[in-house]
Amino acid sequence: MGNIKIMGGDFSSQLELEHAAVVAGFPSPADDYKHERLDFNRDYIRHPEASFYGDVTGDSMKDAGIFDGDKVIIDRAVQAHDGSIVVAFWNGEFTMKYLDLTHKSEGYVELRPANKDYPVFRVEAGDNFEVWGVVVHLIRTFEKF
């Protein structure tokens, strides 16, 4: 079931990259004059004290575009809602799934994979369960260095 390894985040370092629009059609001559800088921490980490990253293992979320080897940024300060992709601690393991709250009034919630080859987990009131955080960003490496 476990399909994510939680890692501590060191968001104190500054990673600044030159920003350039990536055009899928014809490039604009005005792009030569853009000099905005991307600060990963400023632009993507809203709650540094509550943010972590996770290494994704497995393919249970592949139909959501999350693949084995990806990294996700998890924010524990964000409130999960129905349909959120969450990292949950359930029965002693971390797992990443869609949170389905449609049956909450009936006493259970569901953790839904984004791959039909995996089962839906029904989480009952007495289960050892916690929504540990909400997945807010995905990082994928296309080219290995």
Residue ranges and their predicted role:
Residues 1-62, 93-94, 108, 129-132, ...:
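Short, positionally conserved secondary-structure boundary motifs
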Residues 63-64, 72-73:
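Charged, well-structured alpha/beta interaction segments
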Residues 69-70, 84:
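Structural motif
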Residues 94-126:
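Aromatic- and Lys/Arg-enriched surface recognition patch
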